[in-house]
């Protein structure tokens, strides 16, 4: 039986609130934005994963912690036990095809971020990304239990005008918001 770092991490941190982020681009930025918002709101937050702090570098946390994970397709590929109360797929574009073979396989592996969720959990998908849209079909076919929330970019221009920061002038970072 194979136990992945994600599975072991979840087993050690079942009591924490886990937010996981995957996608081809923007994972680190999105994790940092969420971390800053939650820290500003006085939550105890740790961000781990491919963002520079390996997942298993975090020891068992207390119930009052929010753990933000940046997760790659490599980590999701063999994970069977991992569960995240909030999981998001930001976008998908052709990448890592030398490992996953084709886009269909890559998309299916990315969708595994939702497989361990239950009825009280939330799944967020960028519904304006053509590859991410196909995950909605996987969601229905697999009869996944979490609440699916498709995210659209409608109205984001109003928000960006209120945030006077040159960082959000790039298309990718606007999409991350």
What are these regions (language model features)?
Residues 43-55:
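Short beta-strand-centered segment that lines the nucleotide-binding/catalytic pocket of NTP-utilizing
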